[in-house]
Amino acid sequence: MNDDVVRGSAIIADGKGRFGIDTIEVDPPAAGEVRVAITAAGVCHTDHASLSWPGPRVMGHEGAGYVEAVGEGVEGLQIGQPVVLNWAIPCGHCFQCERGAAPLCERTHELDVAHLGTSRAHAGATRWRGRPIERAFHLGTFARYTLVRAEAVTPLPPNLLLDVACILGCAVMTGVGSAINVAAVAPGDTVAVLGCGGVGLNVIQGARIAGARTIIAIDRVPARLERARELGATHALAPDEADRDHIRLVAQVHALTAGRGADHAFEATGVPALAFLPLKLARNGGNALQVSGAHGPASMELTELFWNKRYLAPLYGGCVPSRDFPRLFEWIAQGRLELAALISHRYPMEALDRAFDDMLQGRGTKGVLRIA
């Protein structure tokens, strides 16, 4: 165990839409905690949305790095071991956990070490300019060091590069899990995926792994559609901007699914106005899922819910890290789950503004920050 306080760079949001790089201090881990030296972190729409959350806070919720220090009682983790982080830490005992809904754990905030008011961070375990600071999703992966519960840390298999593995904890888990755990895509099913960024491409991978017969990728960016094809999409549709009511797009999806609509239709664009479009793409009795975590108001005609259509907005792909990380690792080893092909851009910490702009403008598929 390293008993020293460490200092390192972090990207800090001020709660008013601005962010900057500064130095934070991180205490050594207490019992049941691990301090991780982050080397790479994924960038997603939720990180951009967090700019408006109450601040200040250390940004970032996808990341990978090395175990730098372990607290008393931590087993199975060694200093120097490569690890990936996750923010969904179930307690295992609350109402939701006992009914098998661990991603909805009612005590998640109590189990972290970064939530001010309920944990050691309130007393200053992580500090910025001499004052306690919160970390996004209990992690704050846009920082050289983070202090987390041991349950948030999963050892990585050999030969899995950190700047690739860093996206496993959210984008991959959410996308693949939404297809397999929540929608329960089955062999022979038809799937439509609206939006082919980091989450959408992993929905496509999950559907392919599950044995879907038809996987329809929908995006306005040709490069994203090409990548979707490479990762398992059987068809690629580029919506026409003139088709504002999506009449033509809906007709195209129905034409590819025997006139019925898809068994499962996913929204992964992050655009609130498109949140309910999957209901038009799904067949009667089918599933429509909003998996992008889109923020903002949206409206729909209630008739879209007729004919036994189900609308779901799953959290974290219904994943339980202790169960689902081993499955992801197995699929990676088998060559069934691609990671490197998902990442289109890598940026230094100083270029987060450019990473956000590329993401919001649809340039590329998934961005990763190099943390130093």
Predicted regions and their residues:
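N-terminal Rossmann-fold NAD(P) dinucleotide-binding loop
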Residues: 200-201
